[in-house]
Amino acid sequence: MSASYLPSILVPLVGLVFPAVTMASLFLYIEQDEIV
């Protein structure tokens, strides 16, 4: 199995996408809370 390229994809994915999703969900939660 050629899974040696997996970390080079997962590390940036987890390092960039996860914080972005967290920031986006937090931003939407704050915006929704301010509207209501």
Curated annotation (Swiss-Prot):
Keywords: Chloroplast, Membrane, Photosynthesis, Photosystem I, Plastid, Thylakoid, Transmembrane, Transmembrane helix
BP GO terms, sorted: photosynthesis
A Pfam family: PSI_8
A cellular component annotation (GO) from this entry: chloroplast thylakoid membrane
Transmembrane segments: 9-29
Highest taxon, organism lineage: Eukaryota
Membrane topology: Single-pass membrane protein
Coiled coil: none
Localization in the cell: Plastid, Chloroplast thylakoid membrane
Function, as annotated: May help in the organization of the PsaL subunit.
NCBIfam families for this protein: PRK11877.1, PS_I_psaI
Family membership: Belongs to the PsaI family.
Protein's UniProt name: Photosystem I reaction center subunit VIII
Organism per entry: Staurastrum punctulatum
Taxonomic lineage of the native organism: Eukaryota, Viridiplantae, Streptophyta, Zygnematophyceae, Zygnematophycidae
